[in-house]
């Protein structure tokens, strides 16, 4: 809801779009000014497109720029996750608490940032793995290779540092040594 073009026809969700027909990039603006019925229409269209293209439900619901944690969008995301019977990403304790109260599944802990410096260097990964709390933790990562598609992203070149960190043999060894079980959202119970 905060980057690119919608799946829905622009005329059906005008409160979500700028004059060029693209989503406003500001999650707080979207939460404050987007019409809830238009948010729901677009989210349903995105899920329907996912199911049509992949032939299955998504493993979880997530939102770019964390827009899904802001009311009233959060309630729409929660209702859709309930309807689909799938978990969701919860970036903060308040969202996790609210999701848990509704019986929604989510990792118990969330770690990650996307600022001017790469977050998941090998050193930071090793430090987090050494002090990982009990339960399921999500590490929000943005690994990748810098290319023309990322020139205008504020988190472009940092992706290569994260890719190196996540594929560092020392990180894999730390995961094995600590008997950490890697999983995906579809495995949350």
Locations of the language-model features?
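Terminal accessory/targeting
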Residues: 1-60, 68-189
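Active-site histidine-anchored catalytic micro-motif
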Residues: 65
